[in-house]
């Protein structure tokens, strides 16, 4: 029972995918669930709740460590995207039949911001600099609302697969920026309610994400995209996700040593730099790529990366907690 509660979101994602294959009609375009309208409302709701949940007071406490902040933000919005471009160029050499949507999915994964809650929780478990982790994860999410769509356009134009930016910019403002900052402004007026209902706020966001994933897979099932590719493609994507995670993890560890960060800062820098947010990644993908029937393929890398980062980083956090020299003091 405890395992089910702690992994409810991942199980929900799996259930959404299974339901899409079993019953794609209602969630597809033109279906009875009106997914296009529901997804837009859901995107705005998620960003509103993100703004409502963000404590600027706590963020300010960790704002002073510029070397740590530089590493995290450079990895999130510079190194990761460059690695994504490298993947985009090199993977077709060893996987010639790779679907273009998978290539776009890896690029998209690489420009997403960090997670907030799990970065902070894992840093706390490993006895790292929790205040700095909160600052960097929250700051990258604020930047990500602006930078992720811009980087998607910039990198995909370099790769030859961009979409018109004008209509996208209007949707970004209407469905992400306005709800996000409305939530931030409203937070101080409903702070007690938000603090008392944190679990419900998270459940609402997770439910919307599960619905967006369901509708994305419904479209791809209706278009018979999965029949064209199958299990071999899925396994290959998982392999490249593991390679990407391992490569970035190694680069972050090396950079922390070069910058001579102390133990607590290294832990915070690592967790904030290697993690990518599914919570913001799914709604932003719907916003940027929503008209594409192969959206589920674009989401596949981040859907594999998410459980991988939780599992591996959980092991790291427990190991670092046990090897903390202050543990018995």
Residue ranges and their predicted role:
Residues 11, 75-83, 110-116, 132-153, ...:
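Membrane-embedded alpha-helical segments of transport systems
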Residues 1-95, 99, 153, 157-263, ...:
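Structural signature of multi-pass alpha-helical membrane transport proteins
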Residues 66-73, 94-111, 128-138, 235-238, ...:
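The feature identifies polytopic integral membrane transport proteins across all domains of life
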Residues 247-256, 299-325:
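Membrane-helix cytosolic exit motif
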Residues 58-62, 117-129, 253-258, 284-290, ...:
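Helix-loop junctions at the membrane interface of multi-pass solute transporters
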Residues 28-30, 224-231, 285-303:
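Extracellular/periplasmic helix-loop-helix junctions in multi-pass membrane proteins
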Residues 88-146, 152, 156-165:
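Membrane-interface helix-loop-helix junctions at boundaries between adjacent transmembrane segments
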Residues 251-286, 327:
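C-terminal hydrophobic structural anchor segments
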């Amino acid at each position: 029972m405890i395992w089910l509660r702690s992994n409810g979101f991942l199980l929900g994602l799996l259930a959404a995918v299974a339901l899409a294959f079993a019953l794609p009609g209602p969630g597809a375009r033109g279906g009875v669930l009106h997914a296009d309208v529901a997804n837009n409302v859901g995107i705005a709701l998620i960003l509103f709740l993100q703004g409502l949940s963000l404590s600027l007071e706590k963020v300010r406490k960790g704002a002073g460590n510029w070397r740590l902040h530089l590493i995290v933000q450079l990895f999130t919005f510079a190194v990761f995207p460059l690695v994504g471009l490298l993947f985009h160029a090199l993977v077709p050499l060893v996987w010639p039949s790779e679907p273009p949507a998978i290539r776009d999915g890896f690029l998209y994964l690489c420009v997403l911001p960090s997670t907030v809650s799990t970065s902070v929780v894992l840093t706390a478990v490993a006895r790292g600099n929790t205040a700095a982790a909160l600052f960097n994860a929250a700051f990258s999410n604020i930047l990500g609302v602006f930078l992720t769509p811009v980087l998607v356009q910039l990198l995909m134009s370099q790769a030859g697969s961009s979409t018109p930016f004008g209509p996208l910019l209007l949707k970004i403002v209407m469905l992400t920026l306005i709800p996000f900052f409305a939530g931030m402004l409203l937070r101080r007026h409903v702070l007690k309610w938000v603090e008392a209902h944190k679990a419900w706020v998270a459940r609402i966001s997770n439910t919307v994400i599960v619905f967006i994933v369901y509708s994305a897979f419904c479209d791809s099932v209706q278009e018979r995209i999965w029949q064209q590719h199958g299990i071999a493609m899925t396994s290959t994507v998982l392999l490249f996700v593991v390679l990407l995670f391992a490569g970035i993890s190694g680069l972050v560890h090396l950079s922390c040593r070069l910058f001579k960060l102390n133990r607590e800062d290294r832990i915070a820098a690592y967790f904030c730099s290697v993690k990518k947010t599914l919570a913001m990644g799914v709604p932003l993908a719907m916003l940027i790529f929503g008209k594409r029937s192969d959206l589920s393929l674009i989401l596949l890398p981040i859907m594999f990366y998410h459980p991988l980062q939780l599992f591996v980083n959980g092991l790291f956090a427990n190991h670092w907690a046990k090897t903390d020299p202050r543990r018995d003091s």
